[in-house]
Amino acid sequence: MESPSLPMTAKDWTTTSLHRVFAMQGGEDDLSYVNNSDSQALAITLSKPILISSLQSIKLFSDQTPIKITDLGCATGSNTFTTVDTVVETLQRRYTARCGGGGSPEFEAFFCDLPSNDFNMLFKLLAEKQKVDSPAKYFAGGVAGSFYDRLFPRGTIHVAVSLSALHWLSQIPEKVLEKESRTWNKGKTWIEGAKKEVVEAYAEQSDKDLDDFMSCRKEEMVKGGVLFVLMAGRPSGSSSQFGDQDTRAKHPFTTTMEQAWQDLIEEGLIDEETRDGFNIPAYMRSPEEVTAGIDRCGGFKIGKMDFLKIVEYSDEKQEEWKKDPVSYGRARTNLVQAAIRPMVDAYLGPDLSHELFKRYENRVSTNQEFLHITCFYGVVVFSAIRV
């Protein structure tokens, strides 16, 4: 069968075009990020003490201007609201303790993400939440743009958070898109198990992106402000993107994803070059890489840095899946679609994208081994004070 004309090619993955199509799956159906972000919610819950501790340790801002908070890479759903609530409530308690009931300033929260994010859904959910909270805890606004660029005037942000977002790169490394080079990622759609040159190209892009992120925050934040970041990461000393073999085998971006792409090739729906031109723009940094990036930037003092392991599913849920592998396959496919479906749609087109994820679901549903091994998602979390 002749390969169809595709909407995008490997060379289209410039910063501009990736920003145009990259977003978590919008809406609130079974594929949406809203309904497939439990692991991120658990990571936020486990790291919450680090955020609260950093907010309790800083000197309170003394002027009467509103306290400005931003969530960088907010996506959609309750995770962003939960974290902003934590910031507001923690600081309100401190101001009340110091000044009494009328001593707390007003708060503004800016929800930031790429223009392709589903801001309509985000603010629909926020409006529903604020009806329950009435009166609202803060004034809210949306900012469409990349957190690898400046988003706010100099010295205006008091608290900046970024949750499960900074492992997404600003672009596919240009070297990886050069077909005749050693860095062409042949046979792969990500870097786990890829050639050393491919991994190094991703690491270089990761360092550049982290430098850009930190430099922008350095300009935007007030002295004494808090930067709190949680991102997918890997353990210290691990050359792999993961810390254990089971996670390496079971992670949504690895074995099953590669098999699903290979199925399309073997069925004549796409050719190998089409598969090789698609690369997932994610890199799991180690704590050492994150620390080095903060140090290169200067202007921040690290308060706390930690690596956490987030279990994919509880033991009880795992036992449920063993009895119903078809539902497990569907749930796992929904999870990966929530993260990368918009990007795959843009690359393959909706029809071929649908075929890819059908094969992904079938692979997961029929892999009995997956039901008996545990996958952990690693996260690096840190708090830092603007100095």
Swiss-Prot record:
Reported EC number(s) for this entry are: 2.1.1.276
Annotated S-adenosyl-L-homocysteine binding lies at: Y33, C74, N79, D113, L114, S146, F147
Q: Which residues bind Mg(2+)?
A: N185, R275, D276, F278, N279
Write out the catalysed reaction.
gibberellin A4 + S-adenosyl-L-methionine = O-methyl gibberellin A4 + S-adenosyl-L-homocysteine
- Give expression by tissue: Expressed in siliques and germinating seeds. Not detected in leaves, stems, flowers and roots.
Query: Which of this chain's residues are annotated to bind gibberellin A4?
Result: Q40, H167, W168
Which domain of life, per UniProt?
A: Eukaryota
pH relationship of activity: Optimum pH is 8.0.
Q: Name one GO biological process term.
A: methylation
Can you name one GO molecular function term for this protein? S-adenosylmethionine-dependent methyltransferase activity
Q: How is the cofactor bound?
A: Binds 1 Mg(2+) ion per subunit.
List, alphabetically, the InterPro entries matched: MeTrfase_7, MeTrfase_capping, SAM-dependent_MTases_sf
Name the needed cofactors.
Mg(2+)
Q: Regulation of activity: what does the record state?
A: Down-regulated by Zn(2+), Cu(2+) and Fe(3+). No effect of K(+), NH(4+), Na(+), Ca(2+), Mg(2+), Mn(2+) and Fe(2+).
Q: What happens when the gene is disrupted?
A: No visible phenotype, even in gamt1 and gamt2 double mutants.
What keywords appear on the UniProt entry? Magnesium, Metal-binding, Methyltransferase, S-adenosyl-L-methionine, Transferase
Q: What induces it?
A: Up-regulated by alamethicin, but not by herbivory.
Q: One Pfam family from the UniProt entry?
A: Methyltransf_7
Give the misc comment: Overexpression of GAMT2 results in dwarf phenotype.
The family note in this entry says: Belongs to the methyltransferase superfamily. Type-7 methyltransferase family. SABATH subfamily.
Q: What does this protein do?
A: Methylates the carboxyl group of several gibberellins (GAs). Substrate preference is GA4 > GA34 > GA9 > GA3 > GA1 > GA51 > GA20. No activity with diterpenes abietic acid and ent-kaurenoic acid.
**What protein name does the entry list?**
Gibberellic acid methyltransferase 2
Species, as recorded: Arabidopsis thaliana
